[in-house]
Amino acid sequence: MTETTDSPSERQPGPAEPELSSRDPDIAGQVFDAAPFDAAPDADSEGDSKAAKTDEPRPAKRSTLREFAVLAVIAVVLYYVMLTFVARPYLIPSESMEPTLHGCSTCVGDRIMVDKLSYRFGSPQPGDVIVFRGPPSWNVGYKSIRSHNVAVRWVQNALSFIGFVPPDENDLVKRVIAVGGQTVQCRSDTGLTVNGRPLKEPYLDPATMMADPSIYPCLGSEFGPVTVPPGRVWVMGDNRTHSADSRAHCPLLCTDDPLPGTVPVANVIGKARLIVWPPSRWGVVRSVNPQQGR
């Protein structure tokens, strides 16, 4: 009897050789690697996708806020530099410089812009309208404008640092009449003189002063002669009858020590240039040299 051998194609699967099927879950999982891409996305993946899309603009917003903060800091620093070294606004609180500058305790005073650069390269000249820190002898009776409350005072100092609140010092505004080395004097027969020459002062207004210089040449008490020490200036208000200026601070009608009545040039903050407020008063603060003579 001849044995016959079945060909591989005719061999039937036996118990030891299970038939391979693509439907077998194990085989299918190994062969079709792309199945997850074809499957429908579940709720979690959709939520993650939406969250990612929602979060995309946030870095841009943070960047914008950061840029804004940097620009704000730069602006404050530049403004502080300007106030400290270039120019600063000041409020006129009294009538001592009328009619050139308006001011009173119950009205809207002029706000002026003070140039701080001019006197870094030069010195005050006769006729200049200057803002200066009062010398110690001029500060008698001065009261601090700061609050006694620590928190409020801190806020005031911070605002003063950037120029929104006046500094806590006795800042005054007057016109320069004489400078170091010059001799100023006032007599009823000669009026106000510097180095013996009468002054020409078109900025004086008799109606404002309620006095006529032709009748009352000194517009107050006689004084002098006073020789202004080097490095100092003699100042007076344009409203002579309502101004506590150099005349009010020198002893014995200014015939003794000249220092108390004069102002150190080092105390000069700057030169008044412009009236910036209110709009109806916009204009230039002019320097008029009174020593041109009549």
Swiss-Prot record:
<protein>
    <recommendedName>
        <fullName>Signal peptidase I</fullName>
        <ecNumber>3.4.21.89</ecNumber>
    </recommendedName>
</protein>
<feature type="active site">
    <location>
        <position position="96"/>
    </location>
</feature>
<dbReference type="InterPro" id="IPR000223">
    <property type="entry name" value="Pept_S26A_signal_pept_1"/>
</dbReference>
<dbReference type="InterPro" id="IPR019758">
    <property type="entry name" value="Pept_S26A_signal_pept_1_CS"/>
</dbReference>
<feature type="region of interest" description="Disordered">
    <location>
        <begin position="1"/>
        <end position="59"/>
    </location>
</feature>
<dbReference type="InterPro" id="IPR019756">
    <property type="entry name" value="Pept_S26A_signal_pept_1_Ser-AS"/>
</dbReference>
<keyword id="KW-1133">Transmembrane helix</keyword>
<dbReference type="InterPro" id="IPR019533">
    <property type="entry name" value="Peptidase_S26"/>
</dbReference>
<dbReference type="GO" id="GO:0005886">
    <property type="term" value="C:plasma membrane"/>
</dbReference>
<feature type="active site">
    <location>
        <position position="174"/>
    </location>
</feature>
<dbReference type="GO" id="GO:0004252">
    <property type="term" value="F:serine-type endopeptidase activity"/>
</dbReference>
<comment type="similarity">
    <text>Belongs to the peptidase S26 family.</text>
</comment>
<feature type="compositionally biased region" description="Basic and acidic residues">
    <location>
        <begin position="47"/>
        <end position="59"/>
    </location>
</feature>
<dbReference type="InterPro" id="IPR036286">
    <property type="entry name" value="LexA/Signal_pep-like_sf"/>
</dbReference>
<feature type="transmembrane region" description="Helical">
    <location>
        <begin position="67"/>
        <end position="87"/>
    </location>
</feature>
<keyword id="KW-0378">Hydrolase</keyword>
<feature type="topological domain" description="Extracellular">
    <location>
        <begin position="88"/>
        <end position="294"/>
    </location>
</feature>
<dbReference type="Pfam" id="PF10502">
    <property type="entry name" value="Peptidase_S26"/>
</dbReference>
<keyword id="KW-0812">Transmembrane</keyword>
<keyword id="KW-1003">Cell membrane</keyword>
<dbReference type="GO" id="GO:0006465">
    <property type="term" value="P:signal peptide processing"/>
</dbReference>
<keyword id="KW-0645">Protease</keyword>
<keyword id="KW-0472">Membrane</keyword>
<feature type="topological domain" description="Cytoplasmic">
    <location>
        <begin position="1"/>
        <end position="66"/>
    </location>
</feature>
